[in-house]
Amino acid sequence: MSDPHVVARLRAAGCVWAEDEAALLVAAAVSPDELESLVVRRVAGEPLETVLGWVEFLGRRLLVAPGVFVPRRRTELLARRALEHTRAVPAGHGRPVVVEMCCGVAPVAASLEGAHAEVHASDVSATALGCARSNAPSAALHLGDLYDALPTGLVGRVDVLAANAPYVPSDRVADMPPEARDHEPLVALDGGADGVDLHRRLAADAARWLAPGGVLLIETSPGQAGLTTGAMEAAGLATWVGTDDEVGGCVAVGVRPDGVSR
């Protein structure tokens, strides 16, 4: 049950789904003082998810905290594809090795809990990795920049490498909703001049880390998918693009053929 006074304050602040948000805030608060604190934070523009402390993703609640990138529903496509490719690894191959790069709070790694895979996740944010530890307790976490964060023992062993690297062009960041622009780290949003700087870096070294037949999955946008797959093809990967209109997801896929040198 939502509080009409909370609804009115949220609506005045521009919250489109004021009644739904009010009900969530009321349910989360254990006292009137805490409810007031939560409402003040939301009215000030903080994302609802970090106010509540969780985001729903593929049917589970993931821990989020102020200052982290909040997983979007469109990233469910990336997580589903990662799980599908993990399950497709031949049984005689041994445990599949999966890496979530630029993991943030590790939505992909969290989706692989129980998949009987060796899962690694890396990010440049210690705060995000703190959340990732709760969301993906079975994963090995690594702090650092892209491949520099990974143990060298993974070279040539990765069956699935998934990344939701930032892909907003630098000159479009200012146009993003204030919940993202003002409350999420710029490093998790800004993808460089054309939005795919990190995609190029991920693709350039992927063949060295992927096992023969391993796949690189990068979330992108329909308008940038050609740039992302182009970077993969330049690195010797065979590519295609998958989309899901229901969640608004777009994933570029690159496969390492057996003959690509590491």
Label every model-predicted segment:
Residues 25, 45, 75, 108, ...:
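Residue-level signal for inorganic ion chemistry
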Residues 257-262:
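Flexible, glycine-/basic-rich loop-and-beta segments that form/coincide
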Residues 1-16:
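Non-catalytic nucleic-acid substrate-recognition regions in nucleic-acid-modifying enzymes
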Residues 139, 167-197:
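Mobile active-site "lid"/loop adjacent to the S-adenosyl-L-methionine
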Residues 19-85:
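Conserved AdoMet
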Residues 60, 94-97, 214:
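Nucleotide donor/acceptor-binding cores
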Residues 74-175, 223:
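Conserved SAM/SAH cofactor-binding pocket of Class I
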Residues 193-254:
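Conserved Class I SAM-dependent methyltransferase catalytic core
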